Amino acid sequence: VVATPEKLEHNHEQSSGQQRVAVLLMGYGEVESYEDFANYNEQALHLLTAKFAPVPAWIYPPLARILALFDRHEWGHQHNDFISPHNAIFEKQRAGIEKNLQQKWGDRVQVFKAFNFCAPFLPHQVLAEIKNQGFDKLLIYPLLVVDSIFTSGIAIEQVNKALSQLTDGSEHWVKGLRYIPSFYNEAAYIDMMVHLVEEKIASDLAAAYLPAEIGIVLMNHGCPHKAKGFTSGITESQALYDLIRDKLINRYPLISIGWLNHDTPLIEWTQPNVEQAAKNLIQLGAKAVMFMPIGFATENHETLLDVHHIIHALEKKHFQVNYVQMPCVNDHPDFLAMAAQWANPHIADLLSEEATTVNPQLAVAHHHHH
């Protein structure tokens, strides 16, 4: 449930007559019931695959059902009825960020979560709830490291669609809006990535391996090279990797970017993929390989299952190598504190600025004249 009636009443009582901001924290969401695979896949095909793959729309429903069979096999049979922890972790992130924000702003700020593909937290459902609670200022905050058409881009697409459906007459209910597209270059996040790597090496690897024998694969979400002119995420992902690498390379020479790609036919993806990156480091003398997710803030089936598959495949050929799989930042208190910190200036702007009234009826079609 997004909010209980008691909480609703309490909020109105305390906040009447003062400015309030709703923070819309957005993530992908993952299925928790295997029955939902086909529906989830069809939405993902429409919103994600359509941005880069030349696939006609009529093929989405049958393709989604076929993909659901593969998903069920992988999650159910290969991984002992795996249930993704993604949604539960995201809720902890939402609660933790809200707690941090409310220490500064009190009940003037509330954090709502929305999932791109999972009811009952679809953007249109959550925005309807935000409107019902009387909020008129909105901070759109996809909790995604890198900005691309596949992350923050679809968040904005869904929010725009939902807001147009929630418009009443001649005055729009949203009076102020801000947006945080990504945090790939935030110093606090970069330093945290470096610290987590160094900490793990010190506790698990430093006693048995020379620094030059420790391979580090810094994992980003794979990106197709062509995305119909949309921002694909490659530039920010590469910049994120470079910033972290620069802080580690003098002590640990064996570092590589590794892209967690989706193997789709006819589509050129970023290279090297994670498995190839690890093989390259092993070839250069790595006796231990660490897999560190940098382009993912919340654990999901890719960071868990895909990396598990990759390690399993590597173990068959290079059984003498020690493999270390690192978690995402998830609900680490330091991450939740910094994520709240990034929102503070935008919340301050929203609370201090004059309300802007938008009349949707003025947006009539203008013909282009030569």
Give the positions of each predicted feature:
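Active-site-proximal alpha-helix that buttresses catalytic centers in soluble enzyme cores
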Residues: 2-370
